[in-house]
Amino acid sequence: QLEIKEAQVDEALRRLGGLDGFELEPIVPAAEQWRYRNKLEYSFGSVDGELCCGFHAPGSWSEIVPLEDCLLASERGNEARRVALEALRPLGLAPYDRRAHTGFLRNLVVREGRRTGDLQVRLVTSPGPFDGSSFAEAMVGVGATSVIHSVAERTGETTHGGRDTLLAGSPEIEELCAGLRFSLGAEAFFQTNTEMADVLYGTAAEFAGLKGWERCYDLCCGIGSIGLVLAPNAGEVVGVEIVEQAVEDARRNAALNEITNATFIEGNVRVVLKELAEGPARPDLVVVDPPRSGLARKAVARIAEAAPKRIVYVSCNPTTLAPDAAQLAEGGYRLVRVRPVDMFPQTPHIECVALLEREG
């Protein structure tokens, strides 16, 4: 798997990006091959008239395959899913029909704080009456510290954007990573492999090479993870994120860790970066951690216009890293080094950290 993934990164950068002259470092192997995920999202369905909970069948958005044990989830996470299903079956609630858009039970999201012992169980349903007391009691019985009922009003397959009701415990859980404590709300994005997130963020900090005085922009910052890891060795960190709740989470995480030199701005990266770059405070370093789709071309152009000395690009998709790095090369940057990190064994997904430096 490691050889295949490393070759895929090399091919993407050279073939799709037309890039060369960079150092492709050996892929960092995962600490654990199985049961490494701290979060999994399951879907409800029906088999022979009985409620089930599992994953979509390959290539299908309507068929749900039940499972007894997911080998990427912990034993505790699997137990939480099984007990949740046992608690819901007697209630006679219908699973959501993804063709007819009828039914009630949609998704079950199980998230753990692997290093804190916290456990959050979130039930996602369609609108309608629901007495969640017996469900919450069952979840607390398996150690859940946060039990949430989310109502999704959209017809699409999504666990985001609903109305949340706290059934038991706290609305957030906490996790320890890279020497920091992170508070995670119901919809907060956080790397799903805690052990390898340490490696990923450590690599980003290594590539950043901070001396203690630099101004850093953390773009697509989410809940502030990377920026807060960099902050103790930086002069100033400015995080930019389009999701309002994520910005609130980032500010809360800064306060939780007593970090005072990091600020977070809500807005589109392209727009905010233009405003920041027009001011006197130019960045020395830009860190970007975009979604799988990569960056918009205008956002890449804005980064080049801001003219930081270094860019650290944290990528979850080498096929979008390649064209983004190629566009930055056209804007005066050189791809120096790339280090793949195997965050997700037994899957085709690859994380990379890339360092680009401004030429001249």
What residue ranges belong to the model's regions?
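Extended interfacial segments that mediate partner engagement and assembly in macromolecular machines
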Residues: 1-97, 115, 129
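Feature of Fe-S/electron-transfer and energy-metabolism proteins
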Residues: 31-37, 83, 104-107, 217, ...
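Broad gene-expression machinery/nucleic-acid interaction feature
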Residues: 35-41, 50-52, 105-107, 118-120, ...
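Short, low-complexity Ser/Thr-rich regulatory SLiMs
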Residues: 44-46, 112-114, 342, 358
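Short, acidic/hydrophobic/Gly-rich beta-strand patch recurrent on exposed beta strands
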Residues: 54-58, 122, 250
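N-terminal auxiliary segments of SAM/dcSAM-dependent transferases
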Residues: 90, 94-168
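Rossmann-like S-adenosyl-L-methionine
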Residues: 132-360
